[in-house]
Structures are given as C-alpha cells and as structure tokens.
C-alpha cells in the first residue's frame, strides 16, 4: 500500500509539473479502446454496427466518468465509499456522491446523444443501452478503485480508465448480441 501511495505521489508531482494538465498517458487511458475500435471500423472489420456500439459505449463511459468525478468532487455534498457507503473525503478512490452519480448519468446521456446525432448509434433502443452501459461501467470503475487500486501499485488511474472503457465497449457489444 505504501508503494501505491508513493506512486500516486509521483503522478501527482508529474501533473503539478504540467500545471495540473493531463499528459499523453491520460489520453491513451481514456481513448485507446475507442481508437482501436475506430481503426477496426476503418479497416472494414465486421460487424461494423457492433463495433460502432462498442465505440460509442467506450466514450459514453469516459464522459460519464469525467462528469461524475469533476462534478462529484466539486459539488458532492456527501461522498461515500461505493462498497460500504461509509462517508469518505471527496476524491477518495471508489468514492461516489449523489451529485456525481447524476452527473455521470448526464455525461453518458450527452455522449450517447452526440453519437446518435452522428448516426454512430443506429436507434433509440440501442442508444438507451449505450447510456446505461456508460453509467454501469463508471460505477464499476468506482468499485475497482475502492477494492483494488490502492493495493496494487501498477494499477494507475490511466489503466483503470482503460479498463472502464474496455468494460463499456465489451458489455455493450455483448448485450447487442443477445
């Protein structure tokens, strides 16, 4: 646990050295799954519609996470650990708030509506699935943060973000096949 805290301090110092701005590792952690699916779509891999749904879900989950984290930290009145509902300080790995969760839902909805408008999501029922998966993957990311992230030194925020978007894409694609 001490090593993960030390690693967290390293990442914090790196972010502070950049004036709090995100680095390339943040972009890859957030967009690698979507970028990979976009490459597959561009290469003509079939079924295209399934890949598009995975693409949309990965970005719906990412925007849900961003909205939930930022709004939850700033405006969350009561922050609780997702595993125990014990009150914890804002910003704690695995912490959620009502305000942050509602913001996560709004982020997933917003990105899905953009994908629907761009005709990357084929219908309203599929859009509903993408919206739901975006929120579920965000809550799963909080669960992963609460249960594992502080205990595993190499499990960075960027890797957790990549796992979240992967979960969203895979879950949406699997549910489309049902």
Give, region by region, the residue ranges found by the protein language model.
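Helix-coil boundary and interhelical linker segments in multi-pass alpha-helical membrane proteins
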Residues: 38-56, 113-129, 171-178
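Interfacial loop-to-transmembrane junctions
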Residues: 144-166
């Amino acid at each position: 646990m001490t090593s993960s805290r030390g690693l967290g301090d390293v990442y914090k110092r790196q972010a502070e050295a950049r004036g709090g701005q995100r680095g390339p590792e943040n972009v890859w952690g957030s967009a690698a799954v979507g970028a990979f699916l976009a490459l597959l779509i561009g290469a003509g891999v079939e079924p295209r519609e399934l890949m598009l749904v995975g693409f949309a879900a990965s970005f719906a989950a990412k925007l849900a996470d961003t909205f939930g984290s930022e709004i939850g930290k700033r405006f969350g009145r009561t922050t609780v650990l997702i595993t125990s509902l014990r009150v914890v300080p804002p910003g704690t790995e695995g912490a959620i708030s009502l305000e942050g969760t509602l913001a996560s839902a709004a982020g997933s909805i917003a990105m899905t509506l953009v994908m629907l408008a761009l005709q990357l999501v084929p219908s309203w029922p599929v859009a509903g699935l993408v919206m739901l998966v975006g929120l579920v993957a965000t809550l799963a990311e909080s669960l992963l943060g609460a249960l594992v992230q502080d205990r595993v030194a190499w499990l960075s925020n960027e890797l957790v973000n990549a796992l979240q978007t992967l979960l969203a894409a895979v879950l949406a694609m699997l549910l489309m096949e049902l």
